[in-house]
Design a protein with these regions (language model features):
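Alpha-helical scaffold segments that mediate packing/assembly in large oligomeric complexes
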Residues: 1-38, 155-159
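Long, contiguous amphipathic alpha-helices that act as assembly "spine/axial" helices in icosahedral shell
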Residues: 1-14, 37-52, 89, 120, ...
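Sequence/fold signature of self-assembling virion shell proteins
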Residues: 20, 61-159
Length: 159
């Protein structure tokens, strides 16, 4: 999906990936949000998919764990950031990367993609070892990026 993202909506390159730290990881989320703002992406429903190490950087940021607020206390208790910079943060070990480096952290909105599914070639038959009738069919599905301007990518490597 990151291949569909326009060049203007990318931070970093595969040749020169960004190396975030606990002090600036949140700022990169803000920068992704600004790119989506400039592309007229709706604010409600934004998401970002981050690898575990990037999620860990956010957990080390004082802004998320400073005590005194209910959200910070919750972050300390369960280790989940949840939301930041207008994004719902999704942690995944399946973030596209090149041999453990150059992670492509994807941010966007659900309006950027579409999903379709259909059951075709439906047939009834009689199972060999059972009494009665059964149905079988071919389930086809697929997804496609239809509004690439509503996606943004941060290409980052671990420090």
């Amino acid at each position: 999906m990151d291949a569909a993202v326009p060049g203007g909506n990318k931070i970093g390159t595969t040749g020169a990936p960004i190396v975030p730290t606990k002090d600036n990881a949140y700022e990169y989320l803000v920068d992704l949000g600004v790119l989506l703002d400039e592309s007229d992406t709706p604010i409600d429903g934004r998401f970002v998919v981050v690898p575990a190490w990037f999620h860990g950087l956010l957990l080390k940021d004082e802004r998320f764990i400073k005590t005194g607020s209910r959200r910070a206390d919750s972050t300390l208790a369960n280790g989940q950031v949840g939301e930041a910079a207008g994004f719902t943060i999704l942690k995944s070990n399946n973030v596209p990367n090149t041999t453990g480096a150059k992670y492509k952290i994807l941010a966007g909105h659900s309006i950027a993609t579409t999903y379709a599914e259909q059951i075709v070639d439906l047939q009834t038959y009689q199972p060999e070892k059972r009494f009665g009738d059964a149905v079988k069919g071919l389930h086809v599905y697929g997804a496609k990026v239809v509004r690439p301007e509503n996606l943004a990518v941060l290409i980052a490597s671990k420090s």
